[in-house]
Design a protein with these regions (language model features):
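Conserved ABC ATPase "signature" region
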Residues: 33-51
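Conserved ABC ATPase signature
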Residues: 56-60, 64
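Helical segment within the ABC ATPase nucleotide-binding domain
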Residues: 96-108
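Catalytic Walker B motif of ABC-type/P-loop ATPase nucleotide-binding domains
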Residues: 81-84
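A short, surface-exposed alpha-helical micro-motif characterized by mixed small hydrophobic
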Residues: 123-125
Length: 178
């Protein structure tokens, strides 16, 4: 299982290379040259130039931190990827690019992705199923179009409130269509 934490959770005293390599080095099963090669492959996989490998986390933008953390989450080639608010704190264009990257990784690697998010744009952009938690229970688990039509106060407020309606409008979804 690979995990991408909301704020990246990079080790501030480690370089990008050291952060991504950390899980492999903990296993002590691969020679250092193979660890470095794997890190460089993952850096490129998440859209970062290998020249960033020797930078410190403090020298990275928020979007770059997310991509480095994603590379670390992918370094062990997990079949399951857990994402905690993956687009939180990103500018809209960086958020769109990150969603494109996640969609591409899902398609190319066959990853199963479980994501926690409150970002309606991200939900509509990349989710094939949505599980809504309210009152400490999963109240609905369905494709986004079906979730929108589920009759529950939380669902109505979240998906059909002002922000939800604006997000649906951008995607040309209308409450009457669901």
């Amino acid at each position: 299982v690979g995990m991408l934490f909301q704020h990246g959770a990079l080790y501030s005293a480690f370089t990008v290379l050291e952060n991504i390599a950390f899980p492999l080095r903990e296993l002590k099963a691969l020679p250092e040259d193979l660890v470095r090669d794997a890190v460089m492959v993952k850096l490129q996989m998440v859209g970062l130039d290998p020249a960033h490998a020797h930078k410190m986390p403090a020298d990275l933008s928020g979007g770059m931190v997310k991509r480095v953390a994603l590379a670390r989450a992918l370094i062990m080639d997990p079949p399951l990827l857990l994402l905690d608010e993956p687009t939180a704190g990103l500018d809209p264009d960086r958020s769109d690019a990150f969603c494109d990257l996640l969609r591409s990784l899902h398609r190319e690697l066959g990853l199963t992705v479980v994501m926690v998010t409150h970002d309606l744009d991200t939900i509509y952009e990349i989710s094939t199923r949505v599980a809504v938690v309210a009152d400490r229970h999963v109240i609905v688990n369905a494709p986004p179009r079906e979730v929108i039509g589920f009759d529950h106060p939380f669902v109505r407020n979240f998906f059909l409130g002002g922000r939800g309606l604006r997000a649906m409008e951008l995607l040309r979804l209308h409450p009457a269509d669901v």
